[in-house]
């Protein structure tokens, strides 16, 4: 069995870890970084992921996709998506089934397809370290992700060529990372996870009995559209408003300027965690008839705090709900762990510390803890980590729509998973031969206020007065938190195998098509790498030849020089194209044409090695070297 890796698929950054010698180890990517920006750029030639995509974002804003996690498993008409449509430089569109998709380089793409590019980078990082192919992974998601978002994350894994062995909640993973080496007795920890795009709070009890550790999630809550990106957007809005006030120009209509503004806002926000004032200085941000315009704005930590005060307060509300759901008070919490890059902001730490009335743990790396926890869970699944039991919960209630557009819950939120539940329902009309079962997820009484997970029909019900037929609906949640639903007509005793036709998400056929597309791109990428290699070799050959021509000077006959220059021109023309064979052929021809030049260079080198009269003979071979002892003679005249 191959190794199972742990991946933190983040909104802003992603991270991969693996068990190495029994310890979870975060792996460095090809650029030498322990985290990879969750940014994907589409160019005419290739797909860039991570730092290389981030570097070119300013010049290619409409085809550079970031924070894709905010769209995964969401409908285009969702309020959260509509908020992003206006501020993202790339184009968010509605797919045929109503899902939120992205359009880049004229191609329409599903969020799982884009997320798969990040997962492929994580997979490659692990393969480079392990020296073997990786096909299995544990992937983390926000605890408050609904069924559609979890399904979409698993789809992303499949498209990337990974079998997702387990979907694990991010705060639970962080608690695993924190508690795995701490063998003391019972401990109740609160994990406050404020990442790039999502927020979670989980209350987790860590028990250690007879060497076995149990991590039991007591309650979880959160907001899947609250994170560092929202903090950045407040800063961007402030800077754009200040510029408009001063210059009368609205930068929001210029994608290039907005991308520069985004980078500057993020940088300023990070700086203000360690300093009390910073300056955003963007020369030539735009221009009008009077000439170029520059943006120079001083911003203090206090100003930033006032811009995001309501966002921080918003994160405290789920804390109250989670504590109430767990039937605990703040005094029952032993430790508070902060996870996610946005928790580095001093004001966030201050507010969370004040809420719980205690000091925060400083020994957890907010960027790496989740990936480490995922690697530990991977070790549990593979049998490498023993005596660890993880009991997670479903974050939201699950049920079906019943008469009067009411949601009837079958499984309450914060129920330990995996779990099963069933309930018997009946018909609303006389002689009704079919019922539609509408599956919902959420906490509202009115069905329209909840997330629709899909619906299906149970047909062939025998004619009977209303209320007589007995229809049993069974819900089954697996360890990934993903729901399976079945319905049975108890009168006939015949269970019908019914699959929910999801109202959103990718069909199996679409996922398979995307897997094939990804495989085709893998071949394309390999060919592109080979092409670049050939180009580099050709460029190197031309550069070396030009240098040798200069050094040869008059020693190179004119007709030979002409022949070589013609061959060099052919190489330079071939390099501009995409024909690898043509590049290699022209490079070979240049090598052959340069044979006379090589002879001259070799003759010159040999001449330089020869020794003119009067010079000392070359040193003997090392075997003839005689060791001598020297005695230091002091100069008394010093």
From Swiss-Prot:
Keywords annotated in UniProt: ATP-binding, Chaperone, Nucleotide-binding, Phosphoprotein, Stress response
Domain of life of the organism encoding this protein: Bacteria
Acidic residues bias spans: 624-638
Phosphothreonine PTM sites in chain numbering: 198
GO molecular function annotations of the record: ATP binding; ATP-dependent protein folding chaperone; unfolded protein binding
Compositional bias segments (type: Basic and acidic residues): 614-623
Similarity remark: Belongs to the heat shock protein 70 family.
Function: Acts as a chaperone.
Protein name: Chaperone protein DnaK
Species of the source: Shewanella halifaxensis (strain HAW-EB4)
């Amino acid at each position: 069995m191959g190794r199972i890796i742990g991946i933190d698929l983040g909104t802003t950054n992603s991270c991969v870890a693996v068990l190495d010698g029994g310890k979870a180890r975060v792996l460095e990517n090809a650029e030498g970084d322990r985290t990879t920006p969750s940014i994907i750029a589409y160019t005419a030639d290739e797909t860039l992921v991570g730092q290389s995509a981030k570097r070119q974002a300013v010049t290619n804003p409409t085809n550079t996709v970031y924070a894709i996690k905010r769209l995964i498993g969401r409908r285009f008409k969702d309020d959260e998506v509509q908020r992003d449509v206006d501020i993202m430089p790339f184009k968010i569109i509605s797919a045929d089934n109503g899902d939120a998709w992205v359009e880049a380089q004229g191609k329409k793409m599903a969020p799982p397809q884009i997320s798969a590019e990040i997962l492929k980078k994580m997979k490659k990082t692990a393969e480079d370290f392990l020296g073997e192919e990786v096909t299995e992974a544990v992937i983390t998601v926000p605890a408050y992700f609904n069924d559609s978002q979890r399904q979409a994350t698993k789809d992303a894994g499949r498209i990337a060529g990974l079998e997702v062995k387990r979907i694990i909640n991010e705060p639970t993973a962080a608690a695993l990372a924190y508690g795995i080496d701490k063998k003391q007795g019972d401990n109740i920890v609160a994990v406050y996870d404020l990442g790039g795009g999502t927020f979670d709070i989980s209350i987790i009890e860590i028990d250690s009995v007879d060497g076995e550790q149990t991590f039991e999630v007591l309650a979880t809550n959160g907001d899947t559209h609250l994170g560092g990106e929202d903090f950045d957007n407040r800063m961007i809005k402030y800077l754009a408003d200040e510029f408009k006030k001063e210059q009368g120009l609205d930068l929001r209509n210029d994608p290039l300027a907005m991308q520069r503004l985004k980078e500057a806002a993020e940088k300023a926000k990070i700086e203000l965690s360690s300093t009390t004032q910073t300056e955003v200085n963007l020369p030539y941000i735009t221009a009008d008839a009077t000439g170029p315009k520059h943006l120079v704005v001083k911003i203090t930590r206090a100003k930033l705090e006032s811009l995001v005060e309501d966002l921080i307060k918003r994160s405290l509300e789920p804390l109250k709900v989670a504590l109430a759901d767990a039937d605990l008070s703040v005094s029952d919490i032993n430790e508070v762990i902060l996870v996610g890059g946005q928790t580095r902001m001093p004001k966030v730490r201050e507010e969370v510390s004040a809420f719980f009335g205690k000091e925060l743990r400083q020994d957890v790396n907010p960027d790496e803890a989740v990936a480490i926890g995922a690697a530990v869970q991977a070790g549990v699944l593979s049998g490498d980590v023993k005596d660890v039991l993880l009991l997670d919960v479903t974050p939201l209630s699950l049920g079906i729509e019943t008469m009067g557009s009411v949601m009837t819950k079958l499984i309450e939120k914060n129920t330990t998973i995996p779990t099963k539940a069933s309930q018997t329902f009946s018909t609303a009309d006389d002689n009704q031969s079919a019922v539609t079962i509408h599956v919902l997820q959420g906490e509202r009484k009115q069905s329209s206020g909840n997330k629709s997970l899909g619906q299906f029909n149970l047909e062939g019900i025998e004619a009977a007065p209303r209320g007589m037929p007995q229809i049993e609906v069974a819900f089954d949640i697996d360890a990934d938190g993903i729901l399976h639903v079945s319905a049975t007509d108890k009168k006939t005793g015949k269970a019908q195998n019914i699959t929910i036709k999801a109202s959103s998400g990718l069909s199996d056929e679409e996922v398979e098509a995307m897997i094939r597309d990804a495989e085709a791109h893998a071949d394309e990428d390999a060919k592109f790498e080979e092409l670049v290699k050939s180009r580099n070799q050709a460029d190197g050959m031309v550069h070396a030849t030009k240098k040798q021509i200069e050094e040869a000077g008059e020693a190179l006959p004119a007709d030979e020089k002409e022949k070589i220059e013609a061959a060099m021109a052919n190489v330079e023309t071939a390099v501009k194209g995409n024909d690898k064979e043509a590049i290699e052929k022209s490079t070979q021809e240049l090598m052959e044409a340069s044979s006379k030049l090589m002879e001259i260079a070799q003759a010159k080198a040999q001449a330089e090695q020869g020794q003119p009269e009067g010079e000392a003979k070359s040193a003997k071979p090392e075997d003839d070297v005689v060791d001598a002892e020297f005695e230091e003679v002091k100069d008394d005249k010093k």
